[in-house]
C-alpha cells in the first residue's frame, strides 16, 4: 500500500507581538519603528523555510488567473448596463391615420386643451394623456414656424423686386385710377402734376366734328352762345387720355414679354374694370405682375378701339346728314349715336357735347337755309 501525501497550504497563525523591556523604557515610537522589520523578517523566513510542491504552485497560478478573468468580466458589465438603459428609452409614438385626423380636427377648433378635454380625447383615441399633450405642443410649434416662414417668403419676394419696377407699376396704377374719376378733376390733377404738357410731344389733336361747327354758326346767327364750355375742353381731355394710353401701352409692351396664362374678357364697361384691376395690382403687384399687366394691356387696347369707333361713327353720320343732297328735307336727319361707355373721361363728355350741339340747332333754320348758296 503506497502512501500518497497531499500537500495543503499551511496557515501560520500570527503570533502576538512580544513586548520588550526596552520598549517600555524608550517609548512606543521606538517599538513601532522596529516592529515592521521584525515581522517582515519573520514572514520571509517562514515562507522560505517551507518548500512548495509544483502542483501547489500550479494550483495557485490557476486560481490567480481565474481571479483576473472574473475581474476582467466585471469591467464591461457597466457598459452593458448602460446599453440596457439606452434601450429602455421611450420610443417615438406612431399615430395612426384615424388618430391624426381626430387630433387635427380638434386642433383646428381649439389649439389649447384643458385637462378634462385632453383626458377625453386620450380615452377616445386609446392614447395616453401625455401623448396628446406632447402632440399639441409640437403642432403649435409647427403652426408658428409655418406662419413665420410665410411672412419671411413674402418679405424676401418684395425686396427682390427692383425699386424702379415698383415705382413704374405704381405710376401705371395711379393713371388707371385717375381715368375712373371725374374728367375735370382728372384734368386738374394732371395739370398740377405735369405743368409742361404743352411742351411735350402729344398726340395729334382731332378736329372738331361738323356738328360742333354748325352749332357755333347757328349760335352766332342768333347772337347767343348756348353751348356749354365743356364741349371744347373735352377734345383736349380726350387727346390727353390718348397720349396717356399710348405711353401706357408702350410701357406694357416693354415690361410684358411672356404671354399671360389668364386673360380677362373685354366688355362694354372698360373704365371700372381697369380701375379695379389697378387697385388689385397695387395690393399684390409684387407677385403676379406679368399676369395683371397683360390683362390691363388687353383692356386698354379694347378701350382704345371702342373709343375710336365711338368717335368715328358720329362724324361720318353727321357728314352724310349735312350733304347738299339732303337739303330739301324739312326735318333733321337721324344721327346714329354709338353706345357710350361707362368711363366718364373717355366716352361721356364727347357724347354729351354732341347731344347738346344737336339739341340747340333750330330745325326750321337747318331745313330752310342753304349754306352753299
Swiss-Prot record:
Q: Where is this region: Disordered?
A: 41-89
Does this entry carry the keyword Ion transport?
no
**Which InterPro entries does the entry mention?**
HD, HD_metazoa, Homeobox_CS, Homeodomain-like_sf
> Do you know which Pfam families this protein is assigned to?
Homeodomain
Q: Which UniProt keywords apply?
A: Developmental protein, DNA-binding, Homeobox, Nucleus, Transcription, Transcription regulation
Skewed-composition ranges (Polar residues): 69-83
Q: Which GO terms describe its molecular function?
A: DNA-binding transcription factor activity, RNA polymerase II-specific; RNA polymerase II cis-regulatory region sequence-specific DNA binding
Q: Report the CDD domains cross-referenced here.
A: homeodomain (cd00086)
**One Gene Ontology cellular component annotation?**
nucleus
Gene Ontology biological process: positive regulation of transcription by RNA polymerase II
Source species: Drosophila subobscura (Fruit fly)
- Name-wise, this protein is Protein zerknuellt
Lineage of origin:
Eukaryota, Metazoa, Ecdysozoa, Arthropoda, Hexapoda
Amino acid at each position: 500500500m503506497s502512501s500518497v501525501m497531499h500537500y495543503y497550504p499551511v496557515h501560520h497563525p500570527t503570533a502576538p507581538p512580544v513586548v520588550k523591556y526596552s520598549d517600555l523604557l524608550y517609548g512606543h515610537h521606538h517599538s513601532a519603528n522596529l516592529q515592521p522589520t521584525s515581522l517582515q523578517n519573520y514572514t520571509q523566513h517562514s515562507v522560505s523555510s517551507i518548500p512548495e510542491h509544483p502542483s501547489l504552485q500550479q494550483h495557485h497560478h490557476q486560481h490567480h488567473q481565474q481571479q483576473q478573468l472574473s475581474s476582467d468580466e466585471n469591467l464591461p458589465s457597466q457598459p452593458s448596463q448602460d446599453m440596457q438603459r439606452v434601450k429602455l428609452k421611450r420610443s417615438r409614438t406612431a399615430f395612426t391615420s384615424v388618430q391624426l385626423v381626430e387630433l387635427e380636427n380638434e386642433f383646428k377648433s381649439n389649439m389649447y386643451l384643458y385637462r378634462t378635454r385632453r383626458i377625453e380625447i386620450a380615452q377616445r383615441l386609446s392614447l395616453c394623456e401625455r401623448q396628446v399633450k406632447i402632440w399639441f405642443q409640437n403642432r403649435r410649434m409647427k403652426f408658428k414656424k409655418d406662419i413665420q416662414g410665410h411672412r419671411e417668403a413674402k418679405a424676401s419676394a418684395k425686396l427682390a423686386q427692383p425699386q424702379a419696377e415698383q415705382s413704374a407699376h405704381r405710376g401705371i396704377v395711379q393713371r388707371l385710377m385717375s381715368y375712373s374719376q371725374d374728367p375735370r378733376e382728372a384734368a386738374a390733377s394732371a395739370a398740377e402734376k405735369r405743368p409742361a404738357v404743352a411742351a411735350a410731344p402729344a398726340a395729334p389733336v382731332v378736329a372738331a366734328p361738323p356738328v360742333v361747327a354748325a352749332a357755333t354758326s347757328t349760335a352766332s346767327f342768333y347772337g347767343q352762345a348756348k353751348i356749354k364750355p365743356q364741349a371744347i375742353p373735352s377734345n383736349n381731355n380726350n387727346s390727353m387720355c390718348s397720349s396717356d394710353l399710348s405711353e401706357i401701352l408702350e410701357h406694357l409692351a416693354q415690361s410684358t414679354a411672356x404671354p399671360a396664362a389668364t386673360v380677362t374678357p373685354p366688355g362694354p364697361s372698360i373704365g371700372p374694370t381697369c380701375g379695379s384691376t389697378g387697385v388689385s395690382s397695387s395690393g399684390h403687384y409684387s407677385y403676379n405682375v406679368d399676369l395683371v399687366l397683360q390683362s390691363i394691356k388687353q383692356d386698354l387696347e379694347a378701350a382704345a378701339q371702342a373709343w375710336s369707333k365711338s368717335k368715328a361713327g358720329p362724324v361720318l353720320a353727321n357728314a352724310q346728314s349735312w350733304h347738299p343732297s339732303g337739303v330739301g328735307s324739312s326735318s333733321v336727319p337721324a344721327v346714329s349715336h354709338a353706345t357710350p361707355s361707362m368711363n366718364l373721361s373717355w366716352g361721356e363728355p364727347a357724347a354729351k357735347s354732341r347731344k347738346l350741339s344737336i339739341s340747340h340747332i333750330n330745325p326750321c333754320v337747318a331745313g330752310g337755309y342753304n349754306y352753299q348758296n
